[in-house]
Amino acid sequence: MITRLSTLFLRTLREDPADAEVPSHKLLVRAGYIRRVAPGVYSWLPLGLRALRNIEQVVREEMDAIGGQELLFPGLLPREPYETTQRWTEYGDSLFRLKDRKGADYLLGPTHEEMFASTVKDLYSSYKDFPVTLYQIQTKYRDEERPRAGILRGREFVMKDSYSFDMTDAGLEESYARHRAAYQRIFDRLGIEYVICKATSGAMGGSASEEFLAVSANGEDTFVRATDGDFAANVEAVVTQPGQERPIEGLPEAVVHETPVSETIETLVAWANSIGVTVDGREVQASDTLKCIVVKTREPGAEEWELTGVLVPGDREVDMKRLEASLEPAEVELAVEADFAKYPFLVKGYVGPVGLARNGVRVLADPRVVTGTSWITGADEKERHVVGLVAGRDFTPDGFIEAAEIREGDPAPEGQGTLTLARGIEIGHIFQLGRKYTEAFDVQILDENGKRAIPTMGSYGIGVSRLLAVLAEQRHDEAGLNWSPAVAPYQVHVVAANKDAAAIEAAERYATELSQAGIDVLFDDRPKVSPGVKFKDAELLGMPFALILGRGYADGTVELRVRGGEKTELPVDEAVETIVRLVNEARG
């Protein structure tokens, strides 16, 4: 296929769009791949659509290879299936809801577990029909509170979601393993640098869950890796090693002190050391203090907010993402001034677990807050703290919670050294859902003994449109994009940079011969555009190979440019053969 730039629907830009913050957003707009329609909503222009279709094809090939069968559900869905699983309320404000002219409730699909489960129920009834894997590549909708970074975090996006149905848990594990391997092949073929991380299941439910994160400094997700092992996890899924329980007998009684200048952890530690408080024979450190963070939570469908106290060691900050993941599907917000005014027992800066428990507030503690540990914390009175408050004696948490920040150098699980932190972009997520959705829809199948059984599900998602932005993040330089051959809209960009008639005719011939060899060609045949502009556009658009017919053509040579790599002079009669070989090698 040959596409001529003289007729291609394209306008490149020299300046970054005003609302763009990350490289992928800037370059995809400047290069004419996408165009903003509304916050978080983008049009796909011809070049962008070709690249998107190439990604879809790689995904489709690998899904078909593991026995997946493609179908397509509507994006406009009725309320009832999502009421059955309670996700009509659990999704909260992120769900696009609408009514038809008769007043019936509908939604724009954020994900389709309900549709897959109910369809299998309607069509299959015997164990002989299983296992089965179904998938679709389809547009999804989520009302992101803060859409950002172009198509990295949009409100409309293309996703591949697949679902496996097995009669046994062992079968689910096999389906999960097949999808995991297929995802690795997909991301390897696309040329993405990624990490497989342990993850939380969130609103999806289920047991085992892993994320595929593309390594990127601009990623919204933080993940950790062990220095001496293969452990990797999204920071939300990191489990804190519990503290060592201690005997309570013999510990000194808790004492309340006046602390007029100790509203911060730093001043509290300084005060404690100034009056000679010690811990195990040493000076007090921030980790000996206990922060009591007050948050409010609201369960799906509820109108009222409820207070919750979150206890973390004073040397740690609360990580809101970890906190939200631990309390999901409830909404979570930090308590604000109005809440402190509403509840007089909340003394800002001096809240402690005793006062919260006394007033019926749920208290959740960091796993390090175990029986026998002694703390310095708020005494629930202005300018007062308590020293020697012992867990299991003076207060007992209602449960434990993963809410404290994870830091570089924290111990890794199972003795795998320490943790290092990095940023990433979620590109895939796989779940062993189990029977949450098949039970909700009463999917009953007759097993080989003629008894009714409920199949188990796996759920597997890939952010297809996000992959284009991820590749742009990972594969670009100051001049522009640098696509891998599997994704590039065209493999070769032929540039006629010489106005000599013979050179222009040769460029036409090269484009035709490359096309006949099965290579997609973008041909810059624009007659009134300078060579300099053509070269800049070629670098901005980012095709893997560029064939330049310039001044050297009269001397029997053309120039081959590998995007982001070498420039080579080739004899005119060897150009096509060389490029075909290089493209085929790059395709693998």
Curated annotation (Swiss-Prot):
EC numbers for this chain: 6.1.1.15
Signal peptide: none
Molecular function terms, GO-annotated: aminoacyl-tRNA deacylase activity; ATP binding; proline-tRNA ligase activity
InterPro entries: aa-tRNA-synt_IIb (IPR002314), aa-tRNA-synth_II (IPR006195), aa-tRNA-synth_II/BPL/LPL (IPR045864), Anticodon-bd (IPR004154), Anticodon-bd_dom_sf (IPR036621), Pro-tRNA-ligase_IIa (IPR002316), Pro-tRNA-synth_IIa_bac-type (IPR004500), Pro-tRNA-Synthase_IIa_type1 (IPR023717)
CC annotations in GO: cytosol
Reactions it catalyzes: tRNA(Pro) + L-proline + ATP = L-prolyl-tRNA(Pro) + AMP + diphosphate
Top-tier EC class: ligase
UniProt-listed CDD domains: ProRS_anticodon_short, ProRS_core_prok
Keyword Iron: no
Domain of life: Bacteria
Pfam families attached to this UniProt entry: HGTP_anticodon, tRNA-synt_2b, tRNA_edit
Subcellular location(s) of the protein: Cytoplasm
Keywords: Aminoacyl-tRNA synthetase, ATP-binding, Cytoplasm, Ligase, Nucleotide-binding, Protein biosynthesis
GO biological process, one term: prolyl-tRNA aminoacylation
Function: Catalyzes the attachment of proline to tRNA(Pro) in a two-step reaction: proline is first activated by ATP to form Pro-AMP and then transferred to the acceptor end of tRNA(Pro). As ProRS can inadvertently accommodate and process non-cognate amino acids such as alanine and cysteine, to avoid such errors it has two additional distinct editing activities against alanine. One activity is designated as 'pretransfer' editing and involves the tRNA(Pro)-independent hydrolysis of activated Ala-AMP.
PANTHER family per record: MITOCHONDRIAL RIBOSOME PROTEIN L39/PROLYL-TRNA LIGASE FAMILY MEMBER, PROLINE--TRNA LIGASE
Family the entry assigns: Belongs to the class-II aminoacyl-tRNA synthetase family. ProS type 1 subfamily.
Domain comment quoted from the record: Consists of three domains: the N-terminal catalytic domain, the editing domain and the C-terminal anticodon-binding domain.
Subunit structure: Homodimer.
Protein name: Proline--tRNA ligase
Encoding gene per record: proS
